[in-house]
């Protein structure tokens, strides 16, 4: 029996990965992390979607320790979300170590479940400047987890080389565009669906959807060439 663990935030990218995984694995398990994030509403969204999509299991893990260590606009309400980069060239929404921790815990969970695949929705094409969304990082994490647990483990990244328009096309391929558009939460300010319309996550999501809807056939062809 094939099993996969999906790092699942309840946002556009992870929900798209989850829906795809349900078509390819016998058992799909979701793992969601509560790190005291600014947009904590995403946790309830993830619970609702996990139930609706009938996952084999859905675990919500308390990792608020990360909030104590990682200072970011996503972990401190007192820091406004900015569209400008910080002096170090990173967005102020970057949470240091977040994906290191998430993939480590997802790998441990997969080990316990007897799953040999972890799926995450990170993307280097539209990666928002986050270093822990790059392909080299994911490969390094996979190697470390395999070495550390002495077990074959693959970290799949279905969106790694897709832009946001192609990610919308992927959702549409699985007849889930409306669900992704209306029922997921990507907004850094915690607003479901179209979101606030002004934070970096909402702007990226909106541009991608507009591009996809403007020329579905061409974007679907691009997606087919990549997948």
From Swiss-Prot:
Binds 1 zinc ion per subunit. Coiled coil: none annotated. InterPro entries: QueC, Rossmann-like_a/b/a_fold. One of its GO terms (biological process) is queuosine biosynthetic process. Belongs to the QueC family. It catalyses: 7-carboxy-7-deazaguanine + NH4(+) + ATP = 7-cyano-7-deazaguanine + ADP + phosphate + H2O + H(+). It comes from Shewanella pealeana (strain ATCC 700345 / ANG-SQ1). Pathway: Purine metabolism; 7-cyano-7-deazaguanine biosynthesis. The keyword Metal-binding applies. This is 7-cyano-7-deazaguanine synthase. The keyword Zinc applies. Its EC number is 6.3.4.20. Keywords: ATP-binding, Ligase, Metal-binding, Nucleotide-binding, Queuosine biosynthesis, Zinc. Zn(2+) binds at residues 187, 196, 199, 202. GO terms for molecular function: ATP binding; ligase activity, forming carbon-nitrogen bonds; zinc ion binding. Signal peptide: none annotated. Catalyzes the ATP-dependent conversion of 7-carboxy-7-deazaguanine (CDG) to 7-cyano-7-deazaguanine (preQ(0)). ATP binds at residues 8-18. Its cofactor is Zn(2+).
